[in-house]
């Protein structure tokens, strides 16, 4: 397996696991407090429906939504970078930096820690922009 492809695969796997953890985090708080916003879920545990989700669940849902705005872009740009054979060293560094930045972003989002959340978001965004520029250069 190509070294860069292997690194990309590891980053994709790490991001998948990170997103899975956010789902489990939400589920943990829903189950712990038996607090559900869906009628069928509340009925299943013999509780009334909550007017709104718990604060921890809402925050995790926002972190998840932010992931859905950024991580698919990484999947596409990363695959294109490999296919277009952008420089391995820089591309690999960007893959790792993006993955670490997204993990830090999630932790700081769940903890409500500014300015660290914005800094982590900015690092991840910068990685995407540099990947896009490298792809553009490879195409021209």
Region locations from a protein language model:
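Core segments of transmembrane alpha-helices
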Residues: 65-80
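Cytosolic, membrane-interface loops and tails of multi-pass inner-membrane proteins
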Residues: 24-62
């Amino acid at each position: 397996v190509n070294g860069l492809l292997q690194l990309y695969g590891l980053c994709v796997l790490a991001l998948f696991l990170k997103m899975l953890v956010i789902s489990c985090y939400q589920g943990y708080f829903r189950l712990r407090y038996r607090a559900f916003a869906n009628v069928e879920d509340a009925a299943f545990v013999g509780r009334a429906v909550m007017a709104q989700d718990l604060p921890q669940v809402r925050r995790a849902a926002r972190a998840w939504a932010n992931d859905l705005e950024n991580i698919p872009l990484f999947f596409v740009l990363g695959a294109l970078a490999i296919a277009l054979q952008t420089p391995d060293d820089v591309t690999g560094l960007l893959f790792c930096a993006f993955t670490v930045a997204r993990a830090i972003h999630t932790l700081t989002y769940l903890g409500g820690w500014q300015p660290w959340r914005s800094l982590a978001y900015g690092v991840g965004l910068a990685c995407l922009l540099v990947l896009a520029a490298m792809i553009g250069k490879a195409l021209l």
